[in-house]
C-alpha cells in the first residue's frame, strides 16, 4: 500500500500553495493510494516521529517504509512520478 503524507501548518504560505497540486495528485490515484494531511501544530508527535524539520514536507511510503521525501513545493509531475514508481 502506498501512503502519501503531507506535513503542513496553517500559517505556512507554501503549504497553501501546495494544496491544489496535492489535491490533483490525490484525484489521479483515487483509492489506490492513501493521502493524508498532517498539521504539525496539532499533531506535533507525528512531525517528530517522521523527523519533519520544515513545511511543507511530503513523504511517500510503501508498505510502511519511506521511499521518498519532498521538502518544499514540488511539481505535480514530481509527486506523480514518485507514486507511479512505487505502485
Locate each region found by the language model:
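Short loop/turn elements that flank and shape the SAM/SAH-binding pocket of Class I
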Residues: 43-46, 77
